[in-house]
Design a protein with these regions (language model features):
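Active-site-proximal helix-loop-helix substrate-binding element of RNase H-like nuclease domains
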Residues: 1-13, 17-38, 66, 70-181
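A short acidic-Thr-Gly-centered motif at the start of a beta-strand
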Residues: 39-54, 107-111
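Short acidic, Gly/Ser-rich segments with clustered Asp/Glu that frequently serve as metal-coordination loops
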Residues: 51, 55-68
Length: 181
């Protein structure tokens, strides 16, 4: 259905002056270092590592797609190629694995005005965090908005952009945490 001549083929979707890469890289054949951050000491150590650079990628993992009606289930960060940190959130409570406790520990990081926050659809992440009383300060760079500027008609999912511009096929979020909603 997605070839010229077939019903449902959208020629505009294929039309682009931007180069396309073949997504031949994936988690199986690309070196990576992913770390799960659990506990107060690990969070303090993580903050020191992540603030070594002033450009930090952030993503929130939530229970749904409506930022006004979701619970936080985790936060992911990166400041170096092929390196990532994941902070799981068990519930919305004040306990050591609860969102309020974890976000309070991360508050100095979020309030650092020297950091540039990078992400895909940052408005969503910022709104989710705002519901928990967290305001990210500093500059922002949204890959979804940047892609819109260079290719207004293109598709913008993070997986598609990763394949198109990095040649990397990411593990889908559904495979990691299950279907949202």
């Amino acid at each position: 259905n997605d070839e010229p001549g077939n019903l449902g083929y959208d020629e505009d979707e294929e039309a682009s002056d931007l180069p396309k890469l073949i997504a031949n890289k994936n988690i199986e054949n690309t070196p990576h270092a992913y770390e799960m951050i659990v506990g107060d000491q690990a969070i303090e150590s993580f903050i020191k590592k992540i603030t070594a650079k002033k450009e930090i990628c952030i993503d929130t993992e939530t229970t749904g797609i409506d930022a006004n009606n979701v619970q936080l289930v985790g936060l992911s960060f990166s400041n170096t190629t092929h390196t990532g940190y994941y902070l799981p959130v068990a519930n919305d409570g004040d306990g050591p694995d609860g969102a309020k406790h974890i976000l309070e520990k991360l508050k100095p990081l979020f309030e650092d005005e020297t950091i540039t926050w990078i992400g895909q659809n940052l408005k969503y992440d910022f709104l989710v965090l705002k519901w928990y009383g967290i305001i990210l300060k500093g500059k922002t760079f949204d890959t979804m908005l940047a892609h819109y500027v260079i290719e207004p008609e293109g598709r913008r999912s993070m997986d598609i952009l990763s394949e198109q511009f990095l040649g990397y096929a990411p593990v889908s979020i559904e495979n990691l945490i299950g279907k949202k909603g």
